[in-house]
Amino acid sequence: VRAAGVHLLIDSGPDFRQQAFRAGIETIDALLVTHHHFDHVVGMDDLRPYLFSNRTPIPVHAEPASAHALRDMFSYIFRDGTYPGVPRLEMHDVRGPFDVISRESPEQSVRIIPIPAVHGSLDILGYRIGRFAYLTDVSQIPNASYSLLEGLDVLVLDALRDRPHPMHMTIEKAVETAEKIGARQTYFTHMSHEILHQDFEERLGEGMAPAYDGLTFEAQL
């Protein structure tokens, strides 16, 4: 996400390195973690090259329980006295809205609003940046979070499959949730292989579409 001169990465999955090359990502000012499940954080070590030319540590923002888990999972990064060459990352517990400052131009910053959500029995976070919000791996959105999602240009929302799953929204529930939020455009993500892209697309109304690798869009700050 590029916003107000700040470059943000939401989660770092197993193919982050390949996707970063593909997208031409040259700098990262912060990593926003939705939750600590392996498929969303295993690429964290691949932030290393972004610290070669600028040794300013990259902040990692996560819900407190996920931050604690990540400190254990990546202890070689976050413990005191790490050896030279490990990614210089700083963990920050997310307890409310916060600002991310550009590592290259400290006078530039952007406000981040965390969106509490639920992934099965796990408390997780979505993130709102201006009129864009990202909510993946969601089974429930608490009522209190809906007020944080008003007036969106673009929403990216979890939609796994048609069959129920204890930790993800079904397509039907995701569509209902998107209609309730009322973003101008909703893109569904984290789809399984049980539905083809074109078939999914044909089922959706105006202002809704399945996401895909390489998708780009704009939203107001």
Residue ranges of each PLM-predicted region?
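Cap/insert and terminal regions of metallo-dependent hydrolase folds
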Residues: 140-221
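Binuclear metal-dependent hydrolase catalytic cores
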Residues: 1-135, 201-221
